[in-house]
A protein has these predicted regions:
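Hydrophobic, membrane-inserted alpha-helices
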Residues: 12-15, 165-171, 185-193, 355-359, ...
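Hydrophobic alpha-helical segments
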Residues: 350-438
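Small-residue-enriched transmembrane helix-hairpin modules in multi-pass membrane proteins
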Residues: 139-151, 244-377
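N-terminal "leader" segments that precede or initiate the main folded domain
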Residues: 3-102, 190, 206-250, 416-433
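Membrane-embedded catalytic interface detector for glycan/lipid assembly enzymes
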Residues: 82-255, 339-342
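Hydrophobic alpha-helical transmembrane segments
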Residues: 6-13, 107-120, 156-168, 359-382
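Membrane-interfacial loop-to-transmembrane alpha-helix junctions, especially the N-terminal start
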Residues: 24-38, 179-185, 387-400
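Membrane-interface helix caps and helix-loop-helix hairpins in membrane proteins
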Residues: 51-55, 195-203, 408-416
Length: 438
């Protein structure tokens, strides 16, 4: 076991040194630091066997390290101007001002904010009648069984989530560099939608990670933690931990606001913060060693990683009466509806859904996929930074924030596989290039 820990420490130190000596722009370097630190901390924690979790095999850890290096290699392949952008003075200020005056966007935002508040009201109504665990199960049901109604699953997939991805970047940028009353509506909508499933990840996905991108990575100066900044970060962290504690207690059936509920919530939140850091790595190791590739019928050759576009082809062919076919539904059943145990002894660590984004890459092309696809993604995210520098408009900013979000959450899952997100990214790419500064 010590061999694994020494290996991860050695690789992480080499990686940080390689990043440090690169002559690249400050935001790019900070993004690489965040990605590398999160991955290698998670890999190291997975070797400790905390909370009775199994320890991944050395071969699995080695492949994951190579995958991390592949992304860094693709990222560094693109040459960006060694500069940054003053987000308070750049052309994006004019672009975002025009976007916030767009009547269609404002109208959709108002309607979806009202709808999200209605759903939040239903959430608290149901929470008063039952425990949060039951509510979460009903949140994922389809049709009339869904807690928010038969139309909600499609509304959530096609409209609410893509719009939330779009607004997350606006929120992170606007809170720090732009003042608008619409930011309050965006916050209310994102907070409400993040609460509906009784989960915790969406709070980080839509509210915390965008602030990390624009508050740290694109901070125009050397980042120093002053007393004021430290106090603000501490207050935000405490508020987030308290929120997660309340949710954790509710999922155990403790709905009262008392000491016992808080104790249970703190215990569950602490364990979950740890397990969600390395659990997906242990789950990925489990999948490698339990023939998940054979269960899916062999390699998928890109249909999982690029399901956002493969699904569009499937829809297009079906419209003309041709059965194109896709195995993504079988993959979802294998990934989300099949529960596994990651415990070494007690068999109480039930797990599903989160296997890291390498799960997609491996099932598509095997070990080669774990090298080539992260390399391409690293290439893409650095390219998106270049587009952001060059065009300085709201569309390039949103595209960058979506890719950054997927990068940071790569330890957990792959966030770019849904069809609506694929459509949104294509639209933002085209819009950013059409609106470039003259």
């Amino acid at each position: 076991m010590y061999k694994r820990q020494v290996f991860i420490l050695l690789v992480s130190l080499i990686t940080i040194y390689i990043i440090k000596i690169q002559n690249i722009d400050r935001p790019s370097k900070r993004i690489l630091y965040l990605y590398s630190l999160y991955w290698f901390i998670s890999l190291f924690l997975s070797t400790l066997g905390l909370y009775d979790y199994k320890v991944p095999k050395f071969e699995t850890l080695f492949c994951l390290c190579i995958s991390c290096w592949a992304l860094i290699g693709g990222f560094l392949l693109i040459k960006c101007p060694v500069k940054s952008v003053d987000l308070k003075q750049s052309g994006i200020q004019l672009s975002i001002r025009g976007f916030f005056k767009n009547k269609l966007f404002v109208g959709v935002l108002v309607v979806l904010t009202c709808y999200s508040l209605y759903l939040l009201y239903k959430f608290y109504t149901f929470m008063a009648l039952g425990d949060l665990y039951q509510i979460r199960n009903l949140y994922f049901e389809s049709g009339d069984l869904n807690i928010y109604g038969a139309l909600f699953p499609n509304m959530n997939y096609w409209i609410l989530k893509p719009f939330s991805f779009l607004c997350a970047g606006l929120f992170g940028f606007g809170v720090l560099y732009y003042r608008s009353k619409l930011l309050l509506l965006i916050f209310v909508m994102l907070f409400s939608l993040s609460s509906l499933g009784g989960g915790r990840l969406d709070y980080f996905r839509y509210l915390v990670i965008p602030l990390l991108l624009f508050g740290y990575c694109f901070y125009p100066k050397r980042f120093k933690v002053t007393l004021k900044k430290g106090f603000l970060i501490l207050v935000m962290a405490a508020a987030m931990f308290f929120l997660l504690t309340i949710i954790g207690a509710g999922r155990r059936g403790y709905m009262e606001f008392d000491k016992e509920s808080l104790d249970v919530g703190v215990e569950m939140t602490t364990e979950n913060l740890m397990s969600y850091s390395y659990g997906p790595i242990v789950a990925f190791d489990y999948a490698l060693n339990n023939n998940y590739l054979d269960k899916l019928g062999g390699y998928s050759y890109g249909t999982l990683t690029f399901n956002a576009f493969n699904g569009l082809l499937d829809i297009a062919f079906r419209m003309i009466g041709i059965s194109y076919g896709t195995n993504f539904s079988d993959f979802v059943i294998l990934k989300q509806d099949t529960w596994i145990t990651l415990s070494r002894q007690n068999f109480d660590k039930n797990w599903n859904a989160l296997f890291s984004w390498n799960f997609y890459f491996y099932l598509d092309f095997g070990i080669v996929g774990m090298i080539v696809l992260p390399f391409l993604f690293g290439f893409l995210i650095r390219k998106s930074i270049y587009w952001f520098y060059r065009y300085q408009n709201v569309s390039s900013m949103m595209l960058l924030s979506i890719l950054f979000l997927s990068l940071i959450l790569s330890v957990l899952d792959f966030n770019l596989s849904s069809i609506p997100i694929g459509i949104l990214m294509i639209y933002l790419y085209m819009k950013s290039h059409n609106c470039k500064l003259k």
